[in-house]
Amino acid sequence: MFFIEILGKVKHKDNVANFCENVLLDLMPKNRKEVDVVVKFVTQCDDQESGYCYGDQEEIIISIAKKSLGEAYSFEEQMIALCHELVHAKQIITGELDGNYWKGEPITSRSVLTSPWELEAFSLEKTLFEKFYKVSFDSAILFS
């Protein structure tokens, strides 16, 4: 069971929370743990990243940037970044990614972008976005 809180200035907070829940349930259909998920929409993330995720199996904190290097992200780009970070949330909640360990093996120094946890997140972000964006936002956007 996921308890989702959306913080920061973002339109359609209830829809964003529903979107998060749908993505997480798709990634972890058998999850029975109670997990608090806090999603913060911030002006920008450290190192100009589009998003960041950290936490443990009981609480996940996700930051989503509204801009990077002075350029604003579209709402859709923010939701794709959110999908990417929700994959990392799944990895943390299930114990696949745990501090300096990936699936129980120590993480050696390697390029983060080619790490298995990033490759999984990049491979799923657009699929998850396409699967849940219209369902979660079409009516909200039409009537805003």
Where are these regions (language model features)?
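Surface-exposed helix-capping loop/turn segments at secondary-structure junctions
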Residues: 2, 27-35, 95-98, 132-139
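Auxiliary, metal-adjacent structural segments of Zn-dependent hydrolase domains
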Residues: 2-57, 127
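Short, histidine-centered active-site or binding-site loop motifs used for metal coordination
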Residues: 8, 64-68, 106
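Active-site scaffold of zinc-dependent metalloenzymes
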Residues: 42-76, 92-93
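Post-HEXXH active-site segment of zinc metalloproteases
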Residues: 76-80, 92-119, 123
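Short active-site segment of divalent metal-dependent hydrolases/proteases
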Residues: 83-91
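Long, well-structured alpha-helical subdomains associated
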Residues: 111-114, 118-119, 125-144
